[in-house]
Amino acid sequence: YILGLEEVKDKGKKLISSAQNPQLGSLYENIASKLNQYSKPNDFESIIKLMIIWINRILFLKLLESQIVKWNAKPEYKFLNPTKINDFDKLEMLFFEILAKKQNDRHHREFDYIPYLNSSLFELHEMEEKSLKISNLADDAHIEYYAKTIIKDENLKRKTGEVCTLHYLFEFLDAYDFSSEGSE
């Protein structure tokens, strides 16, 4: 829902497509709009490629965040939240100016507790170089909470109304336990 995708059946096969009734603030619509604005190809495949690159990074970071918090027993080390990452520019900075650099080479000190990750995941992807960086996305994009959202308010009722898409993504990921090791 947040991504702006849905599952459809075509000739007995389940396929993923853009939402029939799109939320303008969804990640898909935000990417499509910006690709169009910059006169870059905005076909389904191009949009999905960018989305996969970015969501893979964010999911990896969610796993990393949960381990950092667990190892240090410091909830304040959570960094995928609107307080520390309030827009797509800051998220891009985290990708390329924090995670991709050794602590000594960083210009930003607010994330010193996050280790250097010697990983191609945090190098600018060819697709980003050719088309769009995550910082190009509209920070003011908003989306309605999904009617059956798992995200609850302080009264334990499902949240309603509009929310910034990036903040919704962080809230959604926070609703799951990424620190569990599972049963063997």
Predicted regions located by residue number:
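Preference for the N-terminal adenyl/adenosyl cofactor-binding alpha/beta module
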Residues: 1-184
